[in-house]
Amino acid sequence: MLDHDVRSYELIARAFVGEPGGLSRDDVLDNVTHYWLTNTAISAARLYWESKLAFFDAKGVEIPVGVTVFPDELYPAPLSWAERAYPKLIHYNKVEQGGHFAAWEQPQIFSTEMRSTFRSLR
């Protein structure tokens, strides 16, 4: 779901003026229509509201973790934070395109990052 923040507004604006940026005008309209017609925007956003205080306080994550930083993400996690939050950080990378819904916006980049993250665990 597109959020109500500056990054989301910029992403939507780029889509509507025809600039490249990951989302097309149809993508934005599909997303808004999906939440409007199913009346699920509030329940989809509930996760963010409930976890707002704990987001920066990740504790007890004992499995291997990979972090990819997308430029249009709501919070681009710095390496120093990722290392503190995830003691078993096995992959950290910054990419040039994508945002909060990277798998939807940039599926090729997302799948490449997933493969890179878990290649060492094979």
Q: What are the residue ranges of the model-derived segments?
A:
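C-terminal subdomain of alpha/beta-hydrolase-fold enzymes, centered on the catalytic histidine
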Residues: 1-122
